């Protein structure tokens, strides 16, 4: 009886391992598809920089940048899959290398939907960043037309 039980347990463990590998393979395929979709949807905006000489607002250009922005700022920009949203452009407002606020622009209206600093708190630069992005919405529009 013990041998039968061990044999059944070994078979069950093999089945679990096969299922685990299949799930991991599916996750890898999904990550690859997400990356390809991201490039297809957002690459036209890569290199776009808006500045007022002190604040630099740049497009997040990779899924890793979304992850790092979310982790650094304590926000859900990566966890909520903003890189998958076709009608959303995410920008990072910085002074030097420091992230000040993260900006979400609706690509249908070219309006700022959200703009927040660390842990979704607004900074002293909040209104200035929103004004800077809104005043330069034409740069986003030009990239959309050129694609």
Give each language-model segment a name.
Residues 1-147:
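Catalytic-core elements of nucleic-acid end-processing and repair enzymes
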